[in-house]
């Protein structure tokens, strides 16, 4: 069970084996503590010290998000990266791994565009060929950027009626971009936990620039799952009327999901992670588990135990 707590001003407490959400001294929700697998606190939601200590001892990750969808960080009882894993990360040839992340992302983008018979698929094919043949990191990044730009042009054909004309961020400028940004924050939290559980250092990456407090490796691995998880959820939600422009609001110079919009997107995101998908290597698992599998396979590749194969939509 994943708890997403969005009730502003509420406090999560531990009492007699249950996690209780209280507001002004009044219990508004209760959960069996040992059935909780992760907790996400959104905005001004507090956590008592006994509850935090219990969650840490149980190895339950606690995500701290802003209401706008910025991931402040994750608390969890994770061991430090294994020295052998850390040495392997620093010693690895980065370009092949960076290429794998980009190729996975662009192949999923191509699959989605082809599924909807959008003409922008041709542009993604060209970007994919450039990425596969890139001999330098900057050229690879250029191919990824061009492929993403064309891909979002294709999505604009499907989502234009909802104000979407292309990807905008910091701040998002329309309801679709608001949902995408919020969904990517959710996804980053999941990938970050998977990387840590694999015993890897999340700040030592290969595609994204490294920087203090920047989870470069988690951002790298996340590229494979943007389209299959977040983009598909957002596209389906707007086209089915589960999300509408009424679920967003203008504030602080941008457009952000309102409380009901956040609640709906969180539910759809969690449901998507439970859906089974076929991996290019032939096995089938829920998407949430596939994220963890890819982190473990990345570790194996870094330790010289096999070649890394990215995940992507292929059928």
Swiss-Prot record:
Broadest EC class assigned to this enzyme: hydrolase
Molecular-function GO terms, alphabetical: DNA binding; endonuclease activity; metal ion binding
Keywords: Antiviral defense, DNA-binding, Endonuclease, Hydrolase, Magnesium, Manganese, Metal-binding, Nuclease, Plasmid
Disulfide-bond pairs as recorded: none
E.C. no: 3.1.-.-
InterPro entries in alphabetical order: Cas1, CRISPR-assoc_Cas1, CRISPR-assoc_Cas1_C, CRISPR-assoc_Cas1_N
One Pfam family, short name: Cas_Cas1
Listed GO biological process terms: defense response to virus; maintenance of CRISPR repeat elements
Cofactor requirement: Mg(2+); Mn(2+)
Binding residues for Mn(2+): 144, 208, 223
Residues in the signal sequence: none
Function, as annotated: CRISPR (clustered regularly interspaced short palindromic repeat), is an adaptive immune system that provides protection against mobile genetic elements (viruses, transposable elements and conjugative plasmids). CRISPR clusters contain spacers, sequences complementary to antecedent mobile elements, and target invading nucleic acids. CRISPR clusters are transcribed and processed into CRISPR RNA (crRNA). Acts as a dsDNA endonuclease. Involved in the integration of spacer DNA into the CRISPR cassette.
Subunit and partners: Homodimer, forms a heterotetramer with a Cas2 homodimer.
Similarity remark: Belongs to the CRISPR-associated endonuclease Cas1 family.
Other observations noted: Probably encoded in a type III-A CRISPR locus.
Protein name: CRISPR-associated endonuclease Cas1 1
Organism field: Thermus thermophilus (strain ATCC 27634 / DSM 579 / HB8)
Gene name, Swiss-Prot/TrEMBL: cas1-1
């Amino acid at each position: 069970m994943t708890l997403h707590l969005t009730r502003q001003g509420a406090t999560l407490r531990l009492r007699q084996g249950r996690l209780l959400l209280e507001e002004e001294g009044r219990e508004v929700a209760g959960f069996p503590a040992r059935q909780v697998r992760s907790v996400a606190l959104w905005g001004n939601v507090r956590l008592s010290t006994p509850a935090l200590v219990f969650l840490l001892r149980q190895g339950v990750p606690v995500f701290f998000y802003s209401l706008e969808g910025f991931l402040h960080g994750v608390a969890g009882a994770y061991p430090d990266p294994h020295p052998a894993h850390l040495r392997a990360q620093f010693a690895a040839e980065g370009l092949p791994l960076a290429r794998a992340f980009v190729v996975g992302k662009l192949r999923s983008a191509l699959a989605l565009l082809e599924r909807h018979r959008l003409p922008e698929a041709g542009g993604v094919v060209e970007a994919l060929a450039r990425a596969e043949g890139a001999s330098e990191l900057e050229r690879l990044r250029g191919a990824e950027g061009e492929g993403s730009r064309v891909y979002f042009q294709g999505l604009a054909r499907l989502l234009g009626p909802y104000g979407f004309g292309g990807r905008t961020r910091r701040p998002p400028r329309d309801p679709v971009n608001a949902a995408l940004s919020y969904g990517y924050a959710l996804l980053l939290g999941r990938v970050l936990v998977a990387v840590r559980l694999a015993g890897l250092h999340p700040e030592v990456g290969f595609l994204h620039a490294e920087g203090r407090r920047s989870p470069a490796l988690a951002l790298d691995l996340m590229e494979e799952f943007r389209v299959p998880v977040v983009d598909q959820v957002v596209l389906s939600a707007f086209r089915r009327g589960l999300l509408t422009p009424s679920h967003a609001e203008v504030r602080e110079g941008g457009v952000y999901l309102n409380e009901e919009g956040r609640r709906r997107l969180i539910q759809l995101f969690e449901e998507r992670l439970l859906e089974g998908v076929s991996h290019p290597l032939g096995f089938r698992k829920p998407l949430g588990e596939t994220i963890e599998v890819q982190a473990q396979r990345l570790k194996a590749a870094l330790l010289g135990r096999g070649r890394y194969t990215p995940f992507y939509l292929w059928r």
